Amino acid sequence: MIDPALLRTFVVVARSGGFSAAARELGTRQSTVSGQVRRLEAQVGRRLLDRDSHRVELTSDGQALVGFAHEILDSIEVAENWFGGDELTGHVRFGVSEDIMTETFPDLLRQFWRQHPRVDLDLRVGLSENLHQQTRISQVDLAFIKRRPGERHGTLVFDDDLVWAGRESEPLGPGEPVPVVAYPPPSITRQAGLAALERAGLGHRISCVTDDLAGLRAAAIAGLGYIVHSRSLLPPPLVVVPHLPDPGRAEYVLVTRPGPRSRAVQALSDLILENAGPRRDGEVAS
């Protein structure tokens, strides 16, 4: 049997890169951490770390065990929450703007599931305006969406600059209309971009319309036109196009349907408010 307490210590050592740093994080002595790792190596019958005077490195078996350890510890947490008195149950219809579904947001969903394994989610991904309307008519319980600056609906989670982006930032020829790749109406980023072009007196043409995130990115990467994009979510190889007018900002908010919130909706809302923020690796704004 592998002791879960030893696995927890090993994961901290692997993450921090050394016994001293792990001991500080765990609030214990370095000798205690080192001894726990030796006990774990004895239990699995493999050497997990290469040690020197400055740092520890994972062996191939150590790298494998880190992956297993995360799965084991996650499963233990779910089981403890299931049997340990967390009686939160229910069904949440949860709407999410497509650009928020980044590599980091699934970690929030996983954290929620670990804490509340008896709550079922009906996940709906789409345009912010559509999800807002579905929330207003009680088709969605909770929505994590964008709004324009100055709008009042929802609870602010974070805001971000909008930028024009494309494969490369070469200037357009004189009088050449700006090629725009966009979602169909009522996309907030589409409206922000077209309004900025109109204010600047620049002509434009909608060179590609798609209601799919992958299609939007593919068209921009292929050079079909420029997109309006949240700055903190800009993925390579797309780059900011500085010669086009500023499309402004977007605010990311939580919106709930009218009426009282269920405990499950409140728990998910609290988790997002405490943990969500600007993304550095992500997708295109919708």
Where are these regions (language model features)?
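Conserved amphipathic alpha-helical core elements
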Residues: 10, 40-41
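Short helix-boundary/capping micro-motifs
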Residues: 11-27
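A short LG(V/I)-centered, amphipathic sequence patch enriched
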Residues: 41-58
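Alpha-helical linker/hinge and terminal dimerization helices associated
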Residues: 43-44, 65-86
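Central regulatory/effector-binding core of bacterial HTH transcription factors
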Residues: 89-150, 210
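Beta-alpha-beta core module
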Residues: 151-155, 221-261
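Secondary-structure junction motif
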Residues: 179-200, 262
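A late-sequence structural motif
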Residues: 244-286
